[in-house]
């Protein structure tokens, strides 16, 4: 560490001013923090402050520093859970009050955050900015050729992306609330845009999602259905949808998560609705349990596959309807084919 500082003592307050502070880590590769810092320490530690601004700081090193300076703070606990990597650039940092309190932090330009802890959402290869304090915060992010992690949310917890962008906001008072705006996700399966909100209303909370998708692969739809939709829906989609392209898909979902899928006595408590069109699809309407000698599932084992299908699909609560305007089965032209499952949960 290299620095040339100045110490001022005023009544019960000591002020350290350190211009051009330089600290090099002992890791491999070594990383260097360069910053301007100002530290104020009161005799009773009730008015301690730390202010720093610099051009580059490793997230891993920042977590270690926070752990050493304020190990009991909420920010240090969050860093321990997230195990972040990557670099902060053009950052500003402020810690106000006693080291035992919660810091007020403002960072900019976060190139990386790796998801390695089971159960903790995360992202690889992310760029963006973050500003936060104990009550509210905002993250604006974008990335290319990375991976997002949503443990427990989707059948496959890891979702790769070619491009990802959006803004997230949060507040903790009067209730924890998360808001996601202008989210865009593009990968080899899906192209989706949308907004989402989550509020801590007890239990699993209340959610609101509105989204649209264009030119997405029908056979990959099951990957993006929330696991709380039930194994019946996800398994059927995985086995029955064999190909084609989904177009003009729209998603509308709101209500208490614990009451999903909002049928029966809970019908008025929320809404889950997915609609759209599909083209040139292949459907195995009645997926078979029959297996080949190698253990592979026999496609079309109980009912002939319907191919070259154009039509519409609808998911409402736990009801599913697939309406094929045209299609072919065993070389027989079909018109007005409808597959409906009133209760996908069984």
Predicted features, each with a name:
Residues 8-14, 31-181, 190-323, 327-329, ...:
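Membrane-proximal interfacial segments on either side of biological membranes
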Residues 21, 27-29:
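Hydrophobic/aromatic interaction determinants used to assemble and anchor large protein complexes
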